[in-house]
């Protein structure tokens, strides 16, 4: 028996490779599937099944392409209604994989079709639970994503409680838990940084599995403090349900080297967005006018999904050398399939062609402190709501302007004003500054090091509130 977790940090997502006697099952594959095929071929094994725990919202799964390339069967739990060929399993249905068995446990709540997959060893002993977004380590999946018709988030939360109590808690303590996500995912509120656990420990430490918790208490607690989902979640879920373009075609389309003239022509004629994915320090030093910064050194794909509202948006890339294919791949993981190419030679090519270059003013926390004390300045704190509430600068002209909702809140800022922008460490503030600049805000200043550096000055702060109490 082979079980491999294939974890993708940028998405905080775990896919799984299971092998027994030459037969392979893949659970929740990523969009690019060649790695799974290569693993199986290396072991002279054949991919037999592709198990999907639900219609994922935070990434585009590779189930459709993997099935086309291997002939493997796609399997969903009860009530799933995909627009492609798949086996819709019954609750408790068992699938044979070599000497192993995989049992479908229908666990509605995160979504109505959500299911866990219980792996039994060759002695038919419960060995591992592939829990999808039903159970994370330290948390459970948010129950607000699949509301429709007369099914409310409270209904879904109630279903989730019953699924956990009737299908998960009843399993033995030594069952290994393999969740679909870890810390950093927006599919839950407080996921552990660990990506593999044991069910007995979760019964002791996970608030959602407390033995003394009533259904009403669970519903209240699991819904408390859930931030609105990123705008791309519903769109990715629909792609996973309806099907999508072949990843190989998407990569071929986007992996095109363009000289400065062709790059500029495409930007103008195709209304393409110029996306600069270099490190923020490089963007600060020089960038193409009206380009947007979202660096691949940070939470790239989720921020793209949160901020670029049209999945069909034509995109042109400015990347670090050698990162072109990786960038196209990471865009496709969240459904952005319309990359038209990249600037060959990067920003140096643009400069050599005599094209216009802009910079972003960036100052130290110490310099910012002097301005804050001696002038009336406008400060934008672009951190998340919980970060801001925990502690922030205390001042009349300090404005919370969360990057997550910058598109919705543009009317809260004035293009005639000068804004000093900070986040926690200096990544998100540059994203926000680039968006504002592209929309005609000519006077934006980044505070290098963000709130982490500002805290080391003597500027006034609000009293710290532990985030766990918010």
Please report, for each region that a protein language model flagged, where it lies by residue.
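Rhodanese-like catalytic fold shared by cysteine-dependent sulfurtransferases
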Residues: 142-144, 150, 201-238, 242, ...
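Active-site metal-binding motif and surrounding structural segment of the metallo-beta-lactamase
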Residues: 33-75
């Amino acid at each position: 028996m082979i079980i491999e977790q294939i974890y993708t940090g940028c998405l905080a997502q775990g896919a799984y490779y299971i092998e027994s006697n030459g037969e392979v099952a893949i659970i929740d594959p990523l969009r690019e599937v060649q790695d799974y095929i290569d693993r199986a071929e290396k072991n002279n094994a054949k991919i037999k099944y592709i198990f999907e725990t639900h219609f994922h919202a935070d990434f585009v799964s590779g189930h459709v392409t993997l099935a086309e390339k291997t002939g493997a069967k796609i399997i969903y739990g009860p009530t799933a209604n995909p627009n492609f060929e798949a086996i819709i399993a019954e609750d408790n249905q068992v699938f044979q994989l070599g000497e192993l068995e995989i049992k479908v446990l229908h666990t509605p709540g995160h979504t109505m079709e959500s299911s866990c997959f219980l792996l039994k060893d060759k002695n038919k002993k419960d060995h591992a639970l592939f829990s999808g977004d039903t159970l994370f380590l330290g948390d459970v999946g948010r129950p607000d994503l699949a509301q429709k018709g007369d099914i409310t988030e409270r209904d879904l939360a109630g279903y989730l409680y019953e699924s956990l109590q009737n299908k998960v808690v009843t399993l033995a303590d030594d069952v290994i838990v393999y969740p679909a996500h870890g810390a950093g995912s927006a599919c839950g509120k407080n996921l552990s940084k660990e990506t593999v656990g044991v069910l007995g420990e979760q019964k002791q430490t996970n608030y959602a599995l407390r033995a003394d918790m009533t259904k009403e208490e669970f519903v209240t607690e699991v819904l408390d403090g859930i931030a609105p989902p990123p705008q791309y979640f519903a769109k990715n879920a629909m792609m996973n349900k309806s099907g999508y373009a072949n990843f190989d075609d998407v990569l071929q389309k986007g992996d095109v080297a363009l000289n400065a003239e062709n790059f500029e022509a495409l930007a103008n004629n195709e209304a393409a967005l110029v996306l600069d994915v270099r490190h923020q320090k490089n963007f600060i030093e020089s960038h193409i006018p009206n380009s947007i910064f979202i660096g691949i050194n940070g939470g790239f794909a989720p921020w793209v999904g949160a901020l670029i509202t049209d999945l069909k948006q034509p995109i042109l890339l400015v990347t670090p050398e050698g990162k072109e294919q990786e960038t196209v791949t990471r865009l496709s993981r969240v459904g952005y399939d319309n990359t038209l190419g990249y600037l060959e030679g990067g920003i140096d090519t643009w400069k050599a062609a005599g094209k216009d270059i802009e910079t972003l003013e960036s100052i130290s926390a110490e310099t910012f402190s002097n301005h804050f004390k001696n002038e009336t300045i406008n400060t934008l704190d672009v951190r998340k709501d919980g970060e801001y509430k925990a502690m922030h600068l205390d001042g009349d002209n300090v404005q919370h302007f969360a990057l997550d909702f910058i598109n919705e809140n543009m009317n809260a800022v004035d293009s005639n004003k000068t804004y000093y922008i900070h986040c926690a460490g200096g990544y998100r503030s540059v994203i926000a500054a680039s968006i504002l600049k592209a929309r005609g805000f000519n006077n934006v200043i980044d505070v290098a090091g963000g709130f982490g550096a500002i805290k080391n000055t003597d500027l006034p702060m609000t009293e710290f509130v532990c985030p766990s109490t918010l």
